[in-house]
Amino acid sequence: MGSFLLCLLLVQLQWCLCSNVLDDLLQQTNIAFLSQQDVIGVIPVNQIPLVGVELCSMFETVGDGQDTLAAMLQTGVQTLVMDIGYDEDAGGWQMCGRTSLSEGISTVSRQIERLFPTLYANLVVLVLRGGAAEAHYEALRDAIGRVGRWTYSAEKVKATSPHLNSLLDDQEKRVLVVALDDSLCEALGTVAFGPEDVAYVEGNDTIDCSEHTDSWSFIEREFHWTDVREYVRLGCSPVITGKSVANISELEALVKVAQVWSWGAGEPALTDANSEMQRCASLGYDSATERATWKSTSCRQNLPVLCQAVNDRYSWLVGTRNLRFDQLNMDSCPSGYKPSVPRTPLEQREVERYLSEHHPSDGQYWIYLNSISVEKCWVVGGPETPCPYVALVSTRNFAAMIVTSSILVLLLLVLIILLDLVRVPIQDNRRSWKRALGSYSKAETEGVPM
């Protein structure tokens, strides 16, 4: 019995230790990226900024092979730009003239499947360059078809304009295909976006990404930590070349810098689990740089709210009253506007432009974003908005569970101590019983006739 109770105690203690480990992992999670994904989830997929790599030059720098391709996807890369061609000697399509396109696409499919049930499931855009002879069209379709389970056709995107959450969660699709060559586009048919559907420039060529609000604006060049986020902020989707990094670790760091365009450095601040002080978000405007970033803020502060036009994503105003976060509602904004948060880099750029013209001094404004319901889970809306990532109990219920578990642990510990220290009467009488049985056996032996 004591051993059984000890096992129960160990299981309980192990649960507590696992909770600590999970909490440590949460501390390491890219909370800024997850919250940004939630914010951008209602934007049409072909208007979402992406961070990608040019595979051929990247293979030259960090090495080629399927493991390298998988590692790139694990860093958070969302766009794979690849030069492809049909190799007569190999009898199939090749990627960068060195590896099988079919094998590369299979690697992409496996990596998507591995990340499918996780928080980091994301969109992957395959951008294909090269020429295709009609005789090899079917082989190309077969190669791209290896990721067909996850592919959403360009034809459907154009017809329905699905937002990111719909594509990832409702449709359970992850892949879009872009063909930058007319012959590739013809080979893939309605599956792929054509060269007329996107803007794509290389090297020192220039592009005004803000003019292409209904499609991706890719810019391929050498990027560094100091400039890559600026391109994203302007609405561009950077394609990082191999000259930008020396290894996978540097690529991962550069991708992370590029992906988070919203929060300021060191934000959102990690607060005490029992504190609700820094669980609301504000937008801070720096007049010197004319830049705005998000920051975690005490929900009890009185600030004006940032308002977005109901029918125009790029029209913004500042409310006239200073309010606490829990006081925000439709009445906090002028007619035709609502409390909101910039959901894309271009929306935030319009906020900066508006503030520079109408509120040119440094300022701080509420945005409709908070983590009041669940710590570290930043969601768009008011204090009662639930966390979309995981189903969690409230802080009060969680505290009640901890108290109950602690009491059970204490009771089990007391029982184990009692069983070890207090003798049971049957155990105390065991020697007496042995003596009685011994005497009886001896008497019975002595009574046997000779």
UniProtKB/Swiss-Prot annotation:
Query: One Pfam annotation, family name?
Result: TIM-barrel_MTC6
The Gene Ontology biological process terms listed for this entry are:
cellular response to hydrostatic pressure
- InterPro entries linked to this entry: C-type_lectin_CS (IPR018378), Telomere_Capping_Maintenance (IPR051008)
- TM ranges: 398-418
Q: Where is the signal peptide?
A: 1-18
Pull one GO CC term from this UniProt entry.
Answer: endoplasmic reticulum membrane
On the tree of life, the source organism's domain of life is: Eukaryota
Q: Which residues lie on this side of the membrane: Extracellular?
A: 19-397
Membrane topology category: Single-pass type I membrane protein
Q: State where it is primarily located.
A: membrane
**Location of the protein in the cell:** Membrane
Q: Which regions of this chain are Cytoplasmic-facing, per the record's topological domains?
A: 419-450
Residues of this chain annotated as glycosylated in UniProt: 204, 247
Keywords, alphabetical:
Glycoprotein, Membrane, Signal, Transmembrane, Transmembrane helix
Q: What does this chain do?
A: May be involved in telomere capping.
Q: What protein family does this chain belong to? A: Belongs to the MTC6 family.
- Name this protein carries in UniProt: Maintenance of telomere capping protein 6
This protein's species is: Eremothecium gossypii (strain ATCC 10895 / CBS 109.51 / FGSC 9923 / NRRL Y-1056)
What's the encoding gene here?
Answer: MTC6
